[in-house]
Regions:
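Replication-associated primase and helicase/ATPase modules
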Residues: 1-70, 74-75, 182-191, 195, ...
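P-loop NTPase catalytic core of nucleic-acid-dependent motor ATPases
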Residues: 6, 11-16, 22, 77-102, ...
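Positively charged interface segments
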Residues: 9, 13-16, 74-75, 119, ...
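Intein modules and their embedded homing endonuclease domains
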Residues: 19-177, 442-445
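A short, contiguous, amphipathic alpha-helix enriched in charged residues
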Residues: 61-69, 198, 243-248, 283-299, ...
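Conserved nucleotide-sensing/catalytic segment adjacent to the nucleotide-binding pocket
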Residues: 264-306
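Loop/turn-to-beta-strand initiation segments
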Residues: 270-273, 313-317
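Phosphate-handling catalytic cores of nucleic-acid transaction enzymes
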Residues: 364-402
Length: 498
Protein backbone atom coordinates (compact mmCIF):
# COMPACT_ATOMS: atom_id res chain seq x y z
CA UNK A 1 0.00 0.00 0.00
CA UNK A 2 1.21 3.51 -0.86
CA UNK A 3 0.77 4.95 2.63
CA UNK A 4 2.05 8.39 1.71
CA UNK A 5 -0.48 8.75 -1.09
CA UNK A 6 -3.28 7.55 1.14
CA UNK A 7 -2.19 9.93 3.88
CA UNK A 8 -2.32 12.88 1.50
CA UNK A 9 -5.80 11.90 0.35
CA UNK A 10 -6.98 11.47 3.92
CA UNK A 11 -5.55 14.85 4.88
CA UNK A 12 -7.52 16.46 2.09
CA UNK A 13 -10.82 14.80 2.92
CA UNK A 14 -10.52 14.06 6.63
CA UNK A 15 -8.72 17.17 7.92
CA UNK A 16 -5.35 15.62 8.52
CA UNK A 17 -5.88 12.09 9.78
CA UNK A 18 -2.45 10.50 9.49
CA UNK A 19 -1.86 7.08 8.01
CA UNK A 20 1.61 5.61 8.37
CA UNK A 21 3.42 4.01 5.44
CA UNK A 22 3.83 0.25 5.69
CA UNK A 23 7.16 0.50 3.98
CA UNK A 24 9.58 3.05 2.56
CA UNK A 25 10.39 2.72 -1.13
CA UNK A 26 13.39 4.32 -2.81
CA UNK A 27 12.57 6.43 -5.81
CA UNK A 28 14.15 4.71 -8.80
CA UNK A 29 13.46 5.72 -12.38
CA UNK A 30 12.60 2.52 -14.27
CA UNK A 31 10.99 2.69 -17.70
CA UNK A 32 7.94 0.39 -17.76
CA UNK A 33 5.10 -0.06 -20.24
CA UNK A 34 1.39 0.45 -19.64
CA UNK A 35 0.64 -3.26 -19.43
CA UNK A 36 3.15 -3.69 -16.62
CA UNK A 37 1.65 -0.73 -14.80
CA UNK A 38 -1.80 -2.32 -14.94
CA UNK A 39 -0.39 -5.62 -13.71
CA UNK A 40 1.35 -3.87 -10.80
CA UNK A 41 -1.87 -2.08 -9.93
CA UNK A 42 -3.64 -5.43 -9.74
CA UNK A 43 -0.94 -6.87 -7.49
CA UNK A 44 -1.07 -3.83 -5.20
CA UNK A 45 -4.86 -3.99 -5.04
CA UNK A 46 -4.75 -7.69 -4.17
CA UNK A 47 -2.16 -6.99 -1.47
CA UNK A 48 -4.39 -4.28 -0.02
CA UNK A 49 -7.37 -6.61 -0.04
CA UNK A 50 -5.49 -9.37 1.76
CA UNK A 51 -4.07 -6.91 4.32
CA UNK A 52 -7.57 -5.57 5.00
CA UNK A 53 -8.83 -9.09 5.71
CA UNK A 54 -10.71 -9.88 2.50
CA UNK A 55 -10.85 -13.51 1.40
CA UNK A 56 -13.00 -15.86 -0.70
CA UNK A 57 -14.79 -18.69 1.07
CA UNK A 58 -15.27 -22.21 -0.26
CA UNK A 59 -18.24 -20.99 -2.30
CA UNK A 60 -16.07 -18.31 -3.84
CA UNK A 61 -17.97 -15.54 -2.01
CA UNK A 62 -16.10 -12.47 -0.87
CA UNK A 63 -15.83 -12.28 2.93
CA UNK A 64 -14.14 -9.96 5.42
CA UNK A 65 -12.20 -11.11 8.47
CA UNK A 66 -12.97 -8.15 10.74
CA UNK A 67 -10.29 -9.15 13.28
CA UNK A 68 -7.65 -8.97 10.57
CA UNK A 69 -9.08 -5.65 9.38
CA UNK A 70 -8.84 -4.25 12.92
CA UNK A 71 -5.21 -5.36 13.19
CA UNK A 72 -4.47 -3.64 9.88
CA UNK A 73 -6.12 -0.40 10.99
CA UNK A 74 -4.05 -0.39 14.17
CA UNK A 75 -0.91 -0.71 12.07
CA UNK A 76 -1.66 2.29 9.89
CA UNK A 77 -3.20 4.64 12.49
CA UNK A 78 -3.10 5.42 16.22
CA UNK A 79 -6.24 4.94 18.30
CA UNK A 80 -7.15 5.57 21.94
CA UNK A 81 -10.30 5.64 24.05
CA UNK A 82 -10.86 8.63 26.33
CA UNK A 83 -14.02 9.19 28.40
CA UNK A 84 -15.59 6.26 26.58
CA UNK A 85 -14.98 7.84 23.17
CA UNK A 86 -12.96 6.17 20.39
CA UNK A 87 -10.37 8.61 19.01
CA UNK A 88 -7.80 8.66 16.19
CA UNK A 89 -4.58 10.66 16.06
CA UNK A 90 -4.61 13.59 13.67
CA UNK A 91 -0.95 14.20 12.91
CA UNK A 92 -1.63 17.44 11.08
CA UNK A 93 -3.39 18.91 14.13
CA UNK A 94 -1.24 17.13 16.72
CA UNK A 95 -4.18 15.85 18.77
CA UNK A 96 -6.46 12.85 19.05
CA UNK A 97 -9.94 13.48 17.64
CA UNK A 98 -13.20 11.60 17.95
CA UNK A 99 -13.56 8.77 15.46
CA UNK A 100 -17.28 9.08 14.86
CA UNK A 101 -19.36 6.80 12.66
CA UNK A 102 -19.09 9.11 9.66
CA UNK A 103 -15.30 9.31 9.84
CA UNK A 104 -14.66 5.60 10.34
CA UNK A 105 -17.16 4.89 7.55
CA UNK A 106 -15.33 7.22 5.17
CA UNK A 107 -11.98 5.62 5.96
CA UNK A 108 -13.26 2.06 5.59
CA UNK A 109 -15.17 2.81 2.40
CA UNK A 110 -12.06 4.31 0.84
CA UNK A 111 -9.76 1.46 1.90
CA UNK A 112 -12.12 -1.30 0.84
CA UNK A 113 -13.23 0.15 -2.48
CA UNK A 114 -9.65 0.94 -3.52
CA UNK A 115 -8.66 -2.63 -2.73
CA UNK A 116 -11.69 -4.29 -4.33
CA UNK A 117 -14.18 -2.06 -6.17
CA UNK A 118 -17.66 -1.96 -4.59
CA UNK A 119 -16.60 -4.22 -1.72
CA UNK A 120 -17.58 -1.85 1.10
CA UNK A 121 -20.64 -2.73 3.15
CA UNK A 122 -21.96 -0.68 6.05
CA UNK A 123 -22.56 -3.86 8.04
CA UNK A 124 -18.77 -4.21 8.46
CA UNK A 125 -18.46 -0.91 10.30
CA UNK A 126 -20.21 -1.84 13.54
CA UNK A 127 -18.11 -4.99 14.06
CA UNK A 128 -14.90 -3.09 13.33
CA UNK A 129 -15.79 -0.23 15.69
CA UNK A 130 -16.76 -2.68 18.45
CA UNK A 131 -13.48 -4.53 17.96
CA UNK A 132 -11.41 -1.34 18.13
CA UNK A 133 -13.19 -0.29 21.32
CA UNK A 134 -12.20 -3.59 22.92
CA UNK A 135 -8.57 -3.47 21.77
CA UNK A 136 -7.22 0.08 21.89
CA UNK A 137 -5.73 1.56 25.08
CA UNK A 138 -7.76 3.66 27.49
CA UNK A 139 -6.39 7.05 28.45
CA UNK A 140 -6.93 8.62 31.85
CA UNK A 141 -6.82 12.40 32.25
CA UNK A 142 -4.28 11.93 35.04
CA UNK A 143 -1.57 10.66 32.69
CA UNK A 144 -1.42 13.97 30.80
CA UNK A 145 1.53 16.08 31.95
CA UNK A 146 0.02 19.22 33.49
CA UNK A 147 3.17 21.23 32.78
CA UNK A 148 2.34 21.04 29.07
CA UNK A 149 -0.14 23.15 27.10
CA UNK A 150 -1.01 22.31 23.50
CA UNK A 151 -1.04 25.25 21.06
CA UNK A 152 -1.58 25.38 17.32
CA UNK A 153 2.12 25.28 16.46
CA UNK A 154 3.43 23.04 19.23
CA UNK A 155 3.35 22.00 22.87
CA UNK A 156 4.48 24.59 25.43
CA UNK A 157 6.24 23.59 28.65
CA UNK A 158 5.35 26.10 31.37
CA UNK A 159 8.39 25.09 33.45
CA UNK A 160 11.12 25.26 30.80
CA UNK A 161 9.22 27.81 28.66
CA UNK A 162 10.12 25.78 25.57
CA UNK A 163 7.91 24.99 22.59
CA UNK A 164 8.03 21.30 21.68
CA UNK A 165 6.72 19.64 18.51
CA UNK A 166 3.34 17.92 18.65
CA UNK A 167 3.59 14.22 19.50
CA UNK A 168 1.00 11.51 20.06
CA UNK A 169 2.79 10.51 23.29
CA UNK A 170 1.33 13.60 25.00
CA UNK A 171 -2.20 12.22 24.47
CA UNK A 172 -3.77 15.65 23.91
CA UNK A 173 -7.36 15.72 22.70
CA UNK A 174 -7.68 19.53 22.75
CA UNK A 175 -5.43 22.41 21.81
CA UNK A 176 -5.56 26.16 21.57
CA UNK A 177 -5.90 27.28 17.93
CA UNK A 178 -3.43 30.12 18.57
CA UNK A 179 0.25 30.02 17.59
CA UNK A 180 2.77 30.58 20.37
CA UNK A 181 5.11 33.39 19.32
CA UNK A 182 7.58 34.28 22.04
CA UNK A 183 7.92 37.98 21.17
CA UNK A 184 4.25 38.69 20.43
CA UNK A 185 2.54 41.51 22.33
CA UNK A 186 -1.04 42.81 22.67
CA UNK A 187 -1.09 46.57 23.38
CA UNK A 188 -4.74 46.99 22.32
CA UNK A 189 -5.90 44.21 24.62
CA UNK A 190 -3.78 45.42 27.55
CA UNK A 191 -5.21 48.92 27.27
CA UNK A 192 -8.75 47.53 27.22
CA UNK A 193 -8.14 45.35 30.28
CA UNK A 194 -6.76 48.30 32.27
CA UNK A 195 -9.90 50.27 31.47
CA UNK A 196 -12.19 47.34 32.33
CA UNK A 197 -10.48 46.85 35.73
CA UNK A 198 -10.57 50.60 36.48
CA UNK A 199 -6.74 50.68 36.60
CA UNK A 200 -6.86 48.39 39.64
CA UNK A 201 -3.55 46.49 39.43
CA UNK A 202 -4.64 43.87 41.98
CA UNK A 203 -7.83 43.10 40.11
CA UNK A 204 -6.01 43.10 36.76
CA UNK A 205 -3.43 40.59 38.04
CA UNK A 206 -6.20 38.37 39.41
CA UNK A 207 -8.03 38.48 36.07
CA UNK A 208 -4.81 37.68 34.22
CA UNK A 209 -4.34 34.60 36.41
CA UNK A 210 -7.92 33.51 35.69
CA UNK A 211 -7.16 33.68 31.96
CA UNK A 212 -3.96 31.70 32.49
CA UNK A 213 -5.69 29.13 34.66
CA UNK A 214 -8.01 28.31 31.75
CA UNK A 215 -5.00 26.95 29.83
CA UNK A 216 -3.58 24.76 32.62
CA UNK A 217 -4.35 21.03 32.49
CA UNK A 218 -5.25 20.60 36.16
CA UNK A 219 -7.72 21.85 38.77
CA UNK A 220 -5.21 22.69 41.50
CA UNK A 221 -6.55 26.24 41.81
CA UNK A 222 -9.95 24.73 42.75
CA UNK A 223 -12.02 27.77 41.83
CA UNK A 224 -15.02 28.64 39.70
CA UNK A 225 -15.32 32.26 38.65
CA UNK A 226 -18.32 34.56 38.86
CA UNK A 227 -17.93 37.63 36.63
CA UNK A 228 -20.52 40.02 38.01
CA UNK A 229 -21.77 43.48 37.09
CA UNK A 230 -24.53 45.23 35.17
CA UNK A 231 -24.43 47.25 31.99
CA UNK A 232 -21.67 47.43 29.40
CA UNK A 233 -18.76 46.56 31.64
CA UNK A 234 -16.42 44.24 29.74
CA UNK A 235 -17.62 40.84 30.97
CA UNK A 236 -18.66 39.69 27.52
CA UNK A 237 -15.51 41.07 25.91
CA UNK A 238 -13.33 39.10 28.34
CA UNK A 239 -15.30 35.90 27.78
CA UNK A 240 -15.16 36.27 23.99
CA UNK A 241 -11.39 36.84 23.94
CA UNK A 242 -10.78 33.91 26.29
CA UNK A 243 -12.96 31.72 24.07
CA UNK A 244 -10.77 32.65 21.08
CA UNK A 245 -7.63 31.74 23.05
CA UNK A 246 -8.94 28.39 24.28
CA UNK A 247 -10.72 27.59 21.01
CA UNK A 248 -14.45 27.72 20.26
CA UNK A 249 -14.62 23.93 19.84
CA UNK A 250 -13.13 23.47 23.32
CA UNK A 251 -15.69 25.66 25.11
CA UNK A 252 -19.13 24.67 26.41
CA UNK A 253 -21.83 27.12 27.47
CA UNK A 254 -23.79 25.35 30.19
CA UNK A 255 -25.61 27.68 32.55
CA UNK A 256 -25.22 27.43 36.30
CA UNK A 257 -28.91 26.62 36.69
CA UNK A 258 -28.43 23.46 34.56
CA UNK A 259 -25.82 21.92 36.86
CA UNK A 260 -28.43 20.18 39.00
CA UNK A 261 -30.42 18.74 36.07
CA UNK A 262 -30.09 15.09 35.06
CA UNK A 263 -28.56 15.71 31.64
CA UNK A 264 -27.52 19.26 32.44
CA UNK A 265 -23.75 18.84 32.37
CA UNK A 266 -23.41 16.28 29.56
CA UNK A 267 -21.98 18.98 27.31
CA UNK A 268 -18.84 19.53 29.39
CA UNK A 269 -17.35 16.16 28.44
CA UNK A 270 -14.03 16.65 26.62
CA UNK A 271 -14.23 20.45 26.96
CA UNK A 272 -11.52 22.70 28.38
CA UNK A 273 -13.62 25.65 29.49
CA UNK A 274 -17.26 26.39 30.29
CA UNK A 275 -18.37 30.01 29.90
CA UNK A 276 -22.05 30.74 30.43
CA UNK A 277 -24.00 33.98 30.40
CA UNK A 278 -26.83 33.85 32.90
CA UNK A 279 -28.90 36.99 33.43
CA UNK A 280 -31.51 35.58 35.78
CA UNK A 281 -31.39 32.58 38.13
CA UNK A 282 -34.76 31.19 39.12
CA UNK A 283 -33.96 29.92 42.61
CA UNK A 284 -31.19 28.80 44.90
CA UNK A 285 -28.50 26.87 43.04
CA UNK A 286 -27.38 23.36 43.89
CA UNK A 287 -23.64 23.24 44.48
CA UNK A 288 -22.96 19.48 44.52
CA UNK A 289 -21.89 19.04 40.88
CA UNK A 290 -20.37 22.51 40.81
CA UNK A 291 -18.02 21.81 43.72
CA UNK A 292 -17.11 18.36 42.38
CA UNK A 293 -16.08 19.78 38.99
CA UNK A 294 -14.16 22.64 40.60
CA UNK A 295 -12.14 20.14 42.64
CA UNK A 296 -11.58 17.76 39.73
CA UNK A 297 -13.45 14.95 41.48
CA UNK A 298 -14.81 12.03 39.51
CA UNK A 299 -18.54 12.46 38.95
CA UNK A 300 -21.17 10.36 37.24
CA UNK A 301 -22.60 12.11 34.17
CA UNK A 302 -25.87 10.98 32.61
CA UNK A 303 -25.98 11.22 28.81
CA UNK A 304 -29.03 11.14 26.56
CA UNK A 305 -29.31 7.88 24.62
CA UNK A 306 -25.86 6.84 25.87
CA UNK A 307 -24.46 5.03 28.85
CA UNK A 308 -23.61 7.22 31.84
CA UNK A 309 -19.89 7.71 32.44
CA UNK A 310 -17.70 8.37 35.44
CA UNK A 311 -15.89 11.53 34.44
CA UNK A 312 -12.85 13.28 35.89
CA UNK A 313 -12.47 16.69 34.33
CA UNK A 314 -9.98 19.57 34.32
CA UNK A 315 -12.59 21.97 32.92
CA UNK A 316 -12.58 25.56 34.17
CA UNK A 317 -15.90 27.24 34.95
CA UNK A 318 -16.74 30.90 34.35
CA UNK A 319 -20.22 32.37 34.79
CA UNK A 320 -21.26 35.84 33.62
CA UNK A 321 -23.87 37.17 36.02
CA UNK A 322 -25.82 40.37 36.47
CA UNK A 323 -26.68 39.29 40.00
CA UNK A 324 -24.93 36.67 42.11
CA UNK A 325 -26.81 33.38 42.64
CA UNK A 326 -28.77 32.51 45.74
CA UNK A 327 -27.55 29.39 47.50
CA UNK A 328 -28.51 27.31 50.51
CA UNK A 329 -24.89 26.19 50.79
CA UNK A 330 -23.31 28.65 53.19
CA UNK A 331 -20.41 26.41 54.09
CA UNK A 332 -16.81 27.49 54.02
CA UNK A 333 -16.28 24.88 51.29
CA UNK A 334 -18.59 26.69 48.88
CA UNK A 335 -17.14 30.17 49.35
CA UNK A 336 -13.61 28.80 49.17
CA UNK A 337 -14.33 27.34 45.73
CA UNK A 338 -15.66 30.50 44.07
CA UNK A 339 -13.86 33.69 43.11
CA UNK A 340 -16.09 36.67 42.41
CA UNK A 341 -14.71 39.23 39.97
CA UNK A 342 -16.54 42.58 40.00
CA UNK A 343 -16.83 44.44 36.70
CA UNK A 344 -17.55 47.92 38.02
CA UNK A 345 -16.64 49.98 34.97
CA UNK A 346 -19.71 50.96 32.97
CA UNK A 347 -18.89 52.15 29.45
CA UNK A 348 -21.10 54.80 27.92
CA UNK A 349 -22.34 54.15 24.41
CA UNK A 350 -20.05 56.80 22.94
CA UNK A 351 -17.02 55.24 24.68
CA UNK A 352 -17.55 51.73 23.29
CA UNK A 353 -15.29 50.60 20.44
CA UNK A 354 -17.54 48.33 18.37
CA UNK A 355 -14.53 46.85 16.59
CA UNK A 356 -12.45 46.21 19.72
CA UNK A 357 -12.71 42.42 19.56
CA UNK A 358 -11.88 42.46 15.85
CA UNK A 359 -8.75 44.50 16.62
CA UNK A 360 -7.73 42.24 19.50
CA UNK A 361 -8.12 39.18 17.27
CA UNK A 362 -5.16 40.47 15.24
CA UNK A 363 -2.91 40.15 18.32
CA UNK A 364 -4.09 36.87 19.85
CA UNK A 365 -0.57 35.43 20.04
CA UNK A 366 0.26 38.41 22.23
CA UNK A 367 -2.84 37.80 24.36
CA UNK A 368 -1.68 34.19 24.68
CA UNK A 369 1.64 35.40 26.11
CA UNK A 370 -0.30 37.62 28.53
CA UNK A 371 -2.29 34.55 29.63
CA UNK A 372 0.88 32.50 30.06
CA UNK A 373 2.33 35.21 32.27
CA UNK A 374 -0.74 34.88 34.49
CA UNK A 375 -0.53 31.07 34.46
CA UNK A 376 3.13 31.08 35.47
CA UNK A 377 2.52 33.56 38.30
CA UNK A 378 -0.41 31.45 39.54
CA UNK A 379 1.70 28.28 39.52
CA UNK A 380 4.62 30.01 41.26
CA UNK A 381 2.20 31.26 43.93
CA UNK A 382 1.04 27.69 44.62
CA UNK A 383 -2.22 28.26 42.71
CA UNK A 384 -3.30 31.14 44.96
CA UNK A 385 -4.78 34.07 43.07
CA UNK A 386 -3.55 37.61 43.67
CA UNK A 387 -5.48 39.12 46.57
CA UNK A 388 -7.71 41.98 45.53
CA UNK A 389 -9.58 44.43 47.76
CA UNK A 390 -12.30 44.69 45.10
CA UNK A 391 -12.76 40.91 45.13
CA UNK A 392 -12.76 40.80 48.94
CA UNK A 393 -15.39 43.54 49.13
CA UNK A 394 -17.85 41.92 46.73
CA UNK A 395 -17.27 38.48 48.31
CA UNK A 396 -17.95 39.79 51.82
CA UNK A 397 -21.17 41.44 50.67
CA UNK A 398 -22.28 38.23 48.90
CA UNK A 399 -21.60 36.07 51.95
CA UNK A 400 -23.54 38.40 54.22
CA UNK A 401 -26.44 38.54 51.77
CA UNK A 402 -26.58 34.75 51.44
CA UNK A 403 -25.91 34.11 55.11
CA UNK A 404 -27.41 36.90 57.24
CA UNK A 405 -26.23 35.02 60.32
CA UNK A 406 -22.67 35.95 59.38
CA UNK A 407 -23.62 39.61 59.11
CA UNK A 408 -25.35 39.31 62.50
CA UNK A 409 -22.16 37.87 63.96
CA UNK A 410 -20.15 40.76 62.56
CA UNK A 411 -22.63 43.49 63.51
CA UNK A 412 -24.47 42.47 66.66
CA UNK A 413 -23.02 39.44 68.41
CA UNK A 414 -19.72 40.46 70.01
CA UNK A 415 -17.05 37.98 71.04
CA UNK A 416 -16.02 38.71 74.62
CA UNK A 417 -14.41 36.15 76.88
CA UNK A 418 -16.28 35.66 80.12
CA UNK A 419 -19.60 36.98 78.84
CA UNK A 420 -22.62 34.84 78.03
CA UNK A 421 -26.13 35.11 76.63
CA UNK A 422 -29.03 32.71 76.76
CA UNK A 423 -29.47 30.63 73.65
CA UNK A 424 -33.02 32.01 73.30
CA UNK A 425 -31.85 35.63 73.65
CA UNK A 426 -29.28 35.15 70.88
CA UNK A 427 -31.94 33.84 68.48
CA UNK A 428 -34.52 36.45 69.49
CA UNK A 429 -31.98 39.23 68.94
CA UNK A 430 -31.21 37.79 65.51
CA UNK A 431 -34.89 37.79 64.53
CA UNK A 432 -35.27 41.36 65.77
CA UNK A 433 -32.16 42.49 63.89
CA UNK A 434 -33.10 41.01 60.49
CA UNK A 435 -36.61 42.41 60.80
CA UNK A 436 -35.27 45.87 61.58
CA UNK A 437 -32.75 45.69 58.73
CA UNK A 438 -35.31 44.37 56.26
CA UNK A 439 -33.16 41.30 55.55
CA UNK A 440 -34.61 38.00 54.35
CA UNK A 441 -33.97 35.23 56.86
CA UNK A 442 -33.58 32.65 54.07
CA UNK A 443 -34.79 30.02 56.52
CA UNK A 444 -32.07 30.79 59.07
CA UNK A 445 -34.53 31.92 61.75
CA UNK A 446 -35.37 28.33 62.70
CA UNK A 447 -33.43 27.24 65.82
CA UNK A 448 -31.57 24.40 64.08
CA UNK A 449 -30.62 26.36 60.94
CA UNK A 450 -29.62 29.38 63.00
CA UNK A 451 -27.38 27.40 65.33
CA UNK A 452 -25.73 25.55 62.42
CA UNK A 453 -25.16 28.77 60.45
CA UNK A 454 -23.82 30.59 63.50
CA UNK A 455 -21.41 27.75 64.23
CA UNK A 456 -20.14 27.74 60.61
CA UNK A 457 -19.70 31.51 60.60
CA UNK A 458 -17.85 31.43 63.92
CA UNK A 459 -15.45 28.80 62.58
CA UNK A 460 -14.73 30.84 59.45
CA UNK A 461 -14.49 34.29 60.99
CA UNK A 462 -13.22 33.64 64.52
CA UNK A 463 -11.62 30.23 64.14
CA UNK A 464 -13.42 28.87 67.18
CA UNK A 465 -16.29 26.55 68.08
CA UNK A 466 -19.44 27.65 69.90
CA UNK A 467 -19.62 26.40 73.48
CA UNK A 468 -22.61 26.37 75.79
CA UNK A 469 -23.18 26.05 79.52
CA UNK A 470 -26.36 25.12 81.37
CA UNK A 471 -27.46 27.06 84.43
CA UNK A 472 -30.65 26.06 86.23
CA UNK A 473 -31.86 24.25 83.12
CA UNK A 474 -31.19 27.18 80.77
CA UNK A 475 -28.56 27.02 77.98
CA UNK A 476 -26.15 29.95 77.70
CA UNK A 477 -23.81 30.73 74.81
CA UNK A 478 -20.38 31.36 76.30
CA UNK A 479 -17.95 34.19 75.46
CA UNK A 480 -20.43 36.27 73.47
CA UNK A 481 -22.61 39.26 74.26
CA UNK A 482 -25.35 41.02 72.31
CA UNK A 483 -24.81 44.64 71.30
CA UNK A 484 -28.36 45.81 71.89
CA UNK A 485 -27.56 49.24 70.46
CA UNK A 486 -27.63 47.62 67.02
CA UNK A 487 -31.18 46.32 67.46
CA UNK A 488 -34.21 48.35 66.37
CA UNK A 489 -35.61 48.57 69.91
CA UNK A 490 -33.27 48.77 72.86
CA UNK A 491 -34.33 46.81 75.87
CA UNK A 492 -32.74 46.42 79.25
CA UNK A 493 -30.97 43.08 79.34
CA UNK A 494 -28.65 41.44 81.79
CA UNK A 495 -25.34 39.94 80.75
CA UNK A 496 -23.88 37.29 83.01
CA UNK A 497 -20.16 36.83 83.58
CA UNK A 498 -18.38 33.71 84.77
Amino acid sequence: MDGNLFSSIMKAFLKGIDIKSDQVQDEVEIPIDDALIEELKTIVANSKAIALGFYYDEKNKLRLNTNKCISYLRKIAEFIIKHGVLMIYNQKEGIFQELNDELIGTILRYLMNTAIPNSWKKVYERDIIDGLIREVPRVDTNIIDDTLISFNNGVYNVVTKQLLPHDKKYMFTNKSPIDYLKEADCPIFKKAIKEITCNDDELLSCLQEIFGNALINNTKAERAFFFTGVGSNGKSFCSEVLTEIVGVNNVSNIQLSKFSERFGIEGIVSKTLNIANENELGGAISTENLKALISGDTINISRKFKQAINYKSTIKLIFLLNTLPDTLDNTHGYYRKILIVPFNRVFKSEDIDRKLKEKVCTELSGVLNWCLEGAERLINNDYNFTESKAVEKVTKAYKEEQNPVEAYLNEVLVYEEGSSETKKAVLDAYKSWIEGEGISARGTDSPQRFRRSLNNSTKINLNCELTYKKIAGTLYLRDFKIDYSKLPKQEVKYTFSN
